[in-house]
Amino acid sequence: MIDFGNFYSLIAKNHLSHWLETLPAQIANWQREQQHGLFKQWSNAVEFLPEIKPYRLDLLHSVTAESEEPLSTGQIKRIETLMRNLMPWRKGPFSLYGVNIDTEWRSDWKWDRVLPHLSDLTGRTILDVGCGSGYHMWRMIGAGAHLAVGIDPTQLFLCQFEAVRKLLGNDQRAHLIPLGIEQLPALKAFDTVFSMGVLYHRRSPLEHLWQLKDQLVNEGELVLETLVIDGDENTVLVPGDRYAQMRNVYFIPSALALKNWLKKCGFVDIRIVDVCVTTTEEQRRTEWMVTESLSDFLDPHDPSKTVEGYPAPKRAVLIARKP
């Protein structure tokens, strides 16, 4: 059973303590009524992983853990088998004692695009909304963050995160809470809030921006990464049934329109710091994610378009401040 007691004890002593007014009851309800049918199988994989304290831990340049002496072939095989029980692995990569988890996404590439534009993360308390397996949280810790809290309701991601955490020596500087942002009170407690790859899944994108703002301290920084299309400040794509085979894509604005949305929600110092086309080198099928990926979602005769005829995925990073 995944235990949240360490997180409760941690935030009881800091400026997130008011979250304890609602969080334990929400988690208890989740444990009692909302667990996925495969959750026990996934959590067993975490439980059966060996307890290892890394001799060398690199979170600054990658997520890599190594032992002082090489593990035996049997130990490596055990780790690999248990981690494969948690497939598909979408966000990474991870290198853990000789087991290299080549995830669908090269999330390290996204981090390399984002990092140069951030305020110094040293000592910061960070919220990562829609954090997936938690890859970027570990990179935030590597960049000096004091605490990284991720929220994501996908329970497989929780188990992937806990598996990686265990292999990183049960590191308590990052925590994943299996809730969506709409389940959080207005904590107003995080120095930096990340929302990467979430906005286009929201039926009400402006409401999402308000929710992000409600989590920030005054003068806190928002890092927003999402799908965009080319166009002026009035350009927004509203896809039909699917976009790149995804059913739950609602609004894809231009970067300039998104800048206006942020302004409308009261953010200031808004910057578009990166815009790039998603390539099939950055998102692709691997032996750790064997189902369809980006190449299957693009027009085989014109990769500048999705199979539905929309512009192929392009992503922008915007940074803004809550006054």
From Swiss-Prot:
Gene3D superfamilies recorded: Vaccinia Virus protein VP39
Signal peptide as annotated in the record: none
Pfam families for the chain: Methyltransf_9
GO-annotated biological processes: tRNA wobble uridine modification
E.C. number(s) listed in UniProt: 2.5.1.-
UniProt catalytic activity: carboxy-S-adenosyl-L-methionine + 5-hydroxyuridine(34) in tRNA = 5-carboxymethoxyuridine(34) in tRNA + S-adenosyl-L-homocysteine + H(+)
Primary enzyme class: transferase
GO molecular function per UniProt: transferase activity, transferring alkyl or aryl (other than methyl) groups
Annotated residues for binding of carboxy-S-adenosyl-L-methionine: 91, 105, 110, 130, 152-154, 181-182, 196, 200, 315
Coiled-coil intervals: none
Keyword terms of this UniProt record: Transferase, tRNA processing
Subunit structure: Homotetramer.
Entry's family note: Belongs to the class I-like SAM-binding methyltransferase superfamily. CmoB family.
PANTHER family for the chain: PUTATIVE (AFU_ORTHOLOGUE AFUA_2G14390)-RELATED, TRANS-ACONITATE 2-METHYLTRANSFERASE-RELATED
Function: Catalyzes carboxymethyl transfer from carboxy-S-adenosyl-L-methionine (Cx-SAM) to 5-hydroxyuridine (ho5U) to form 5-carboxymethoxyuridine (cmo5U) at position 34 in tRNAs.
HAMAP family (UniProt xref): tRNA_carboxymethyltr_CmoB (MF_01590)
UniProt protein name: tRNA U34 carboxymethyltransferase
Native organism: Escherichia coli (strain SE11)
